[in-house]
């Protein structure tokens, strides 16, 4: 049975947060409040209820969470930890942390892209007797391959690897560093999902009476080799350069970047190594795909052709 008229808080105003907010507003009867560190006059003008939150002030967070049943977070680091603490104190029933990528258990301990995610999951585990939580797993967002990068969708602003061409392929200049092999020298695979489809699945999950600890969704699963070939075919141009990589070589490059103190290169290499090691791959169909067969995700080729249509 759908959960009726819940009060749902979305923390953050990135592109994914706003897609989820739009989906809630248009297709559910839930009450929505968007939490932001700055005043959102534009969103308020569009009819959204917004609350300005100071994450350094517990009473500010408590006030914003009054009567909230479920929190969906897209904020990371210390603000998210404070949000979790406040959610527990305000007796919020459910909390979805800012994950929206691969399986956390496969992440490196010292992942440069962690952004406090490990600490957030540990805190939710600590409070598991008081608040329900889930990790939304969607693999790689299509928007990583977008014209002007996923930063143009206001996604991944804290990752340091959200620019055009930062991940696997630069489709404008037709260059690629492709992590096509896994540790066994087999072809590596990954799952990908559009941000719009992630929003659809997340909003459907609001109506589930109990959340599983992890809930996966996907738009498409393919080998990295198939992905770069698909991008080449969509662009109808040959690669000017393409490097086929395996985990050992990527780890060597990453170690060299660490020794040189080259943080920018580390941030670009870390997701490639994670891809080669299968961190963005999981069993399909996804859990939420199975529960919502009426949602037909956009295929990567369809999304890519539309996104790059205006670029020669």
Could you tell me what each predicted segment is?
Residues 33, 49-51, 134, 240-245:
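General small-molecule cofactor/ligand-binding pocket signal
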Residues 36-93, 97, 101-109:
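NAD(P)H-binding glycine-rich loop region in Rossmannoid oxidoreductase-like domains
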Residues 56-62, 141-144, 247-254:
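A short acidic, often aromatic-flanked loop/helix-cap motif at beta-alpha or helix-coil junctions
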Residues 85, 196-204, 301, 305:
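Amphipathic alpha-helical segments that line or abut small-molecule/effector binding pockets
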Residues 215, 220, 224-282:
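Terminal hydrophobic/aromatic helix or amphipathic segment near a protein terminus
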Residues 286-312:
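Amphipathic terminal alpha-helices
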